[in-house]
Design a protein with these regions (language model features):
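Conserved beta-strand hairpin/beta-sheet module of binuclear metal-dependent hydrolase folds
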Residues: 36-83, 175-186
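Ala/Thr-enriched low-complexity intrinsically disordered regions
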Residues: 8, 12-13, 30-34
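Residue-level marker for buried hydrophobic side chains located in beta-strands
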Residues: 61, 91, 114, 184-185, ...
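Active-site HxH/HxHxD metal-binding segment of metal-dependent hydrolases
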Residues: 67-73, 77-156, 240-248
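Metallo-beta-lactamase
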Residues: 67-68, 130, 159-252
């Protein structure tokens, strides 16, 4: 099993707060240096990407924890402790077995809650059977503390993630978008040169195409997609080159 770490540091943004200009008076400026960082870990036999997002507050969210055992736990948790981060939420883009294997250990270790879409509850409740079918160890996930919805905002530290409802690969699939940094945590909707599977229970090819064309492809070309499997890509590259869903036809 290959476990890899990818660390991306985004540009630094300077936010200025100024007083109103007044004649013959100096205007005071308060500058705040902010950043958002993404750490990517690849876990489990499915080579699933688990993401850790954090900013200068040192608060972080864990997205789709895929750790199967204590050895994989120690890689993610060791990074969190070494960086002195404070996890505040676990977020699931969807609840297929490869994306939830580390839900329990993450929530229990850091005493934090799970956030997912309500339409993924049935999948989460059937995860034990899925683990037997795929022959992977499973530590029972807690149920969601909060059901995520389209248009909602997820807050941690000084960072805001916008939620887009993107069904197709899973009935309650969502993606998380950070507009300031033009980043999409995309789960299994859109990959580099490919798209999420539509041959699993609850999948719908028409919905997947609609999610990509009407939710993701409407974002600017320079938005970076961090998918649930494989390398990152950009919206512009996929609109031009993805043979499964182009921006000007139905695909699939």
């Amino acid at each position: 099993m290959v476990i890899s770490l990818r660390f991306t540091s985004y540009r630094t943004t300077i936010r200025l707060k100024s007083c109103h200009d007044e004649p013959n008076k100096f205007c005071n400026f308060a500058a705040k240096i902010t950043f958002m960082r993404i750490a990517r870990f690849t876990f489990n036999p499915f080579s699933e990407n688990t993401y850790l997002l954090y900013d200068e507050s040192m608060e972080c969210v864990i997205i789709d924890p895929g750790m199967t055992d204590e050895d994989e736990d120690s890689i993610l948790f060791g990074f969190i402790r070494d960086e002195k981060l404070r996890p505040v939420k676990v977020l699931n883009t969807h609840c297929h077995i490869d994306h939830i294997l580390g839900n329990a250990s993450s929530c229990n270790t850091f005493d934090i809650k799970l956030y997912a879409h309500e339409k993924e509850l049935q999948m989460l409740e059937r995860a034990g059977a899925a683990s037997l079918m795929w022959n992977v160890p499973y530590r029972e996930s807690p149920l969601p503390h909060h059901y995520i919805q389209e248009g909602e905002q997820i807050h941690f530290g000084n960072t805001v993630l916008d939620v887009l409802f993107t069904p197709g690969h899973a009935p309650g699939h969502v993606v998380f978008v950070q507009h300031q940094e033009k980043v999409i945590l995309g789960g299994d909707v859109l990959f580099k040169g490919s798209v999420g599977r539509v041959d699993l229970p609850g999948c719908n090819a028409t919905d997947l195409v609609s999610s990509i064309q009407h939710k993701l492809y409407t974002l600017a070309d320079d938005y970076v997609v961090y998918p649930g499997h494989g390398p990152e890509t950009t919206i512009g590259d996929e609109k031009k080159h993805n043979a499964f869903v182009r921006s000007d036809w139905s695909g699939l």
